[in-house]
């Protein structure tokens, strides 16, 4: 009998943990969304994965990496543009490659 109560107590603690952390609420919302789908998806598991993935807040590190990527892309575009301008400027002062070889 004592073993039964200990297991019951552990289950209750685990249930409270899931409730506090929002797991039960999130699972319930996703399952309700699946239930309310007019056309059920072929893969209920894929539906759950997709909706659970969207329900979790994004890792802050991912957002920082996105910002860093955007900055680097801007710098890259600026450097490419500057490179074009410098090549055009340089072409004004250097004879074309074919003339150099003839000399």
From Swiss-Prot:
Top-level taxon in the UniProt lineage: Eukaryota
Gene Ontology CC annotation, any one: nucleoplasm
Molecular function (Gene Ontology), one example: transcription coactivator activity
Protein's gene: MYCBP
Compartments (UniProt record): Cytoplasm; Nucleus
Protein name according to UniProt: c-Myc-binding protein
Complexes and interactors: Binds via its C-terminal region to the N-terminal region of MYC. Associates with AKAP1/S-AKAP84. Interacts with MYCBPAP. Interacts with CFAP91.
Function: May control the transcriptional activity of MYC. Stimulates the activation of E box-dependent transcription by MYC.
Major site of localization recorded for this protein: cytoplasm
Entry keyword Transport: no
Keyword Zinc in record: no
Keywords: Cytoplasm, Nucleus, Transcription, Transcription regulation
Family: Belongs to the AMY1 family.
GO biological process entries: regulation of DNA-templated transcription; spermatogenesis
InterPro entries, per the entry: AMY1 (IPR026060)
